[in-house]
Amino acid sequence: MAEPRRVAFISLSPVRRREAEFPGTEREPEYPREPPRLEPQPYREPARTEPPAPREVAPRSDAQPPPREKPLPQREVSRAEPPMSLQREPPRPEPPPPPLPQLHLQPPPPRESTSRAEPQPRPPRETVRLELVLKDPTDESCVEFSYPELLLCGEQRKKPVYTEDPFNDDHQERQEVEMLAKKFEMKYGGKPRKHRRDRLQDLIDIGFGYDETDPFIDNSEAYDELVPASLTTKYGGFYINTGTLQFRQASDTEEDDTTDNQKHKPPKIPKIKEDDIEMKKRKRKEEGEKEKKPRKKVPKQLGVMALNSHKSEKKKKRYKDSLSLAAMIRKFQKEKDALKKESNPKTPLNFSTSSLNKPPSAAVALGNDVSDLNLTSADPDLPIFVSTNEHELFQEAENALEMLDDFDFDRLLDAASNGSPLSESGGENGNTTQPTYASQVMPKVVPTLPEGLPVLLEKRIEDLRVAAKLFDEEGRKKFFTQDMNNILLDIELQLQELGPVIRSGVYSHLEAFVPCNKETLVKRLKKLHLNVQDDRLREPLQKLKLAVSNVMPEQLFKYQEDCQARNQAKCAKFQTDEEREKNGSEEDDEEKPGKRVIGPRKKFHWDDTIRTLLCNLVEIKLGCYELEPNKSQSAEDYLKSFMETEVKPLWPKGWMQARMLFKESRSVHNHLTSAPAKKKVIPAPKPKVKECSPKKDQKTPASSVASVGGPSTSSSTSAVASTSSGSTPVQETICLDDSLDEELSFHPPALDLVSEALAVINNGNKGPPAGSRISMPTAKPRPGLREEKLASIMSKLPLATPKKLDSTQTAHSSSLIAGHTGPVPKKPQDLAHTGISSGLIAGSSIQNPKVSLEPLPARLLQQGLQRSSQIHASSSSQTHVSSSSQAQVAASSHTLGTSEAQDASPLTQVTKVHQHSAVQQNYVSPLQATISKSQTNPVVKLSNNPQLSCSSPLTKTSDKPLMYRLPLSTPPPGNGSQGSHSLVSRTVPSTTTSTNYLAKAMVSQISTQGFKSPFSMAASPKLASSPKPATSPKPLPSPKPSASPKPSQSAKPSVSTKLISKSNPTPKPTVSPSSSSPNALVAQSSHSSSNNPVHKQPSGMNISRQSPTLNLLPLNRTSGLPSTKNLQAPSKLTNSPSTGTVGKNSLSGIAMNVPASRGSNLNSSGANRTSLSGGTGSGTQGATKPLSTPHRPSSASGSSVVAASVQSTAGASLLANASPLTLMTSPLSVTNQNVTPFGMLGGLVPVTMPFQFPLELLGFGTDTAGVTTTSGSTSAAFHHSLTQNLLKGLQPGAQHAAALSHAPLPTHVQQTFNDGGQSKGDTKLPRKSQ
């Protein structure tokens, strides 16, 4: 039984080999049965154990000789299975492989060798061990193995083993290299005939296959039209973007080409001969060669060119004749037809060869004379068709036909007629023969002309058809003659009048008759049109050049003369400079600018003739621009480039600029180049719209304002009104925009002019003191604006100029410069005048720290000027009493009238002041309001208000400021001093924008309340301060103490002291409002600068109130008047600047000066400073420091000296007189309705000054905290501009100023001012609105 098993096994062994391919199916069930799976390593161990098993079996098999070997494997398998099963591995495939490769060999040794890494180099397939991983079967799948695949894997595993053998390594390396070589050959190996096929394709059309619609390909310029046929490029080709082409004679290249072809082809002859070729084909080729041999010999003699092959390809494109190319196409077409008809491949080959041979011969026949055309036609054929070896030619023809099968000749022929690359390349020599022939061979449908064309246009198109037929055989080069261009241009001009659709149809129709495609035709037509336009430009250009050349000699002569004069002047200057250097003169700096001047300018002087010629030229050029299809440039850029490149060179170098040409010809091209966006739109100043509100203000304040300076209140008021020079009538609505005069800011008026204007104003005020009272109330609305203007003027005024003025003038200048502290004149008159000026200026400067000088309304400036002039007149002509009263009246009228009047009354007319005090109390002086506004410290009390109260108008003003001030300053300041310093109170808020509010509020209250005493207003906010002054004109009693100018002065100092000690208790100081007022002013400035709101601001408030009172210590500071009172004030003021408070708040300085100017300017300034010091701890110094502390020192020139303080003080005083002044408005946030009119200042505040505005003058309370730094340097400029603005604003009159204060501002301005004014009105509300 063993035998059969053996046999079965033997017979199955091969099957096993096959089965091994599907071991999974046979033994998969068994494999799954074995639960565990062993990984390769575990399996390797059993495999290693297997070898002993065979060894054991081997001896057993030895007992059985023949069948032993075969059963051995069985036993091996069986024995091997148990271990594998034990190890749960599938080694069954392994046993079959060993028997298969070497069934009859001894398995043990091979297995040992395998396990031992096969030390012997015997056959690699002796034994194979496979590691199989079994997985549990599932219902859907079971493990499957493919024996052949496993065997291959095993062989791969063995390869590294064999690599150990050096011999095997060599063999393997050789095999690897061979494989790599084959791989690269397959990948990169080239086909030898590929190049020739490309050349054959190039023969037909080098450009074939390119996308003609690709914008990158430019076929608009044909090389053959530009380069003669006798020339070719030096190296036989085109190199894009590599420079200029270099040419040489084409005959050489042609001969070289033929010789090259021959030279290259003889070596091929033997190779071809080796091949078997039919005799007929050979004979045909030989015949063709014989015909061409003579030519070949000649080139050989000449020599062979290395670049021949390349040149031949390029020449094909350049020198192809239309006839030869058409013949070639005909030939290829016939060949293609023959190939289609004949199914036998040989027949087409024969036909093709014969046809291929014929064209060369035909070409030769055509060119027996060896003309260029023949050479070019034959030359391209030579490399393919002409050869000494027929067989080679046959192969070439065969390849060519294969390639031609890929060509759509119908499409090529159509393209030829359409001006396709074929036609373009074929007709590059200028031939139209090709398109004509193509149309004959393959008739093409010509697009019909659109209907409805003009008769003339159709006629010209017909002319073009006829001309095209005449030129058909001459090529494109000769096609576009002058006549043809004229026809085309005429057609183009007529087409320009038609629509784009019709134009396109006509172009499509014309395309069939011209040797170019539609796109090229359109480009050519446009180019012709532009050329004609350029021709039209030549004549006008020539005329212009002629005209310029005629005019230039004279201008050049003048220029040379100027140069000579300049040189002479330079020489003279040089000599003088040397002398000055020797003398050590200081004028060298002045001469330096002259030295920098290079020379006279080359400025061309236009005349009408040249301008007309230029315009004509530009008109023609604009016509060209309109013809541009794609306007890549704007008309402006187009013209400018034309002028730069074409027109400008007509002038000598340096004599003309393109921008001048553009400007001179603007009349012609303005419709195209005047885009609104390019124009610089300079917004016009806003119209003055505030007349109504000023009028209302005027009405209310008119009654309440008591003429301070006038003998009687009514007289003062009237005087003020008249002094205002019809300020009430003149009360134009002052727009914030208009209020700031740009020119004034940039060109500040001279101090002298300002002082003169102020003097005039003062003189005017003298007459109508009583009337001024009413005028001032009327001007209430304007006080803000006027004050702003005054502040502007103050900023422009030089700091020290007031000192230079006479005592009277000094008083005025001081008042103008009130913002800058300065000594106040001692004389009551001087004090009064000074007070007026200072009141006007100081109030406004203090009030509007943020307001630029420019913002002040022109009317305010005028009023300021009038007041200053009046003040001058009064101070110079009147005694202390009369001049003071007049000045006060004038000041009152301008600054609300009351302020100035108060200043004067304390000095000379204490009784008058008392009389007016009732009115003034009701009336809030703009200056006072301004000061309060500038004062950021709400603590400042209304002590100054009592001072104002000294003069009835002033007292009223003080009251209002007090009221406003009280709200603003009530929280910060003590209530005690508020009563007396209602103005100061207000000033304190004014630091927080209370000044503006005060001024406005006072003005508005005066106007609205019928001049309820400012104290009454102040009383409501801060009744405790000075209820009487605020509520009623009773503060007049305070002025009464100053009934006599001297007592008034003394009272003023006392009042100032009181203010310093207490702002509130100064209701009585109100009795000497002048002195209190100056103190208030000083305090106010200092308060703006410092944090002490109560004491300093009270005095600041007073000043602001007393701004109407022109008695401003600032005057003393400014002019340093000799008057004892003024001197006292200046000294204190000086202290203030020295402390640096002046620098921080010129307002403080101003405030002091203003009080001094008023009743008893000197005393008041002293008191003022005392008040300030009381607030700060030391007179003026204290006041100044507080100002600097609380705010960015409202005055930029805080560091400026007493002189600066004096100036600012004078300015403040003047501003105070001009109630409209609202310089401090910006800081103010109007809290009270009354203050709202003063809010105008706020509106002004936004205005920026061209120059640094000394903040000390403006007294920017809260807002200007950081401004202090600029005070010193800017004070002079500020005074200047401020004076100018002040004069402007004040000229209209106090009434106008008052009206300005109340005048409603533009909405945005009003809002700003309202915010500022409210803050001013309520000391507690420091610029809350803002």
UniProtKB/Swiss-Prot annotation:
Comp. bias intervals (Basic and acidic residues): 16-37, 67-79, 123-133, 575-585, 688-699, 1321-1330
Segments of skewed composition (Low complexity): 701-730, 864-895, 1017-1029, 1045-1054, 1061-1079
Annotated positions of the Phosphothreonine modification: T244, T253
Key word Acetylation present: yes
Pro residues: compositionally biased ranges: 93-111, 1030-1044
Family: Belongs to the ubinuclein family.
Name the record gives this protein: Ubinuclein-2
Protein species of origin: Bos taurus
Recorded name of the encoding gene: UBN2
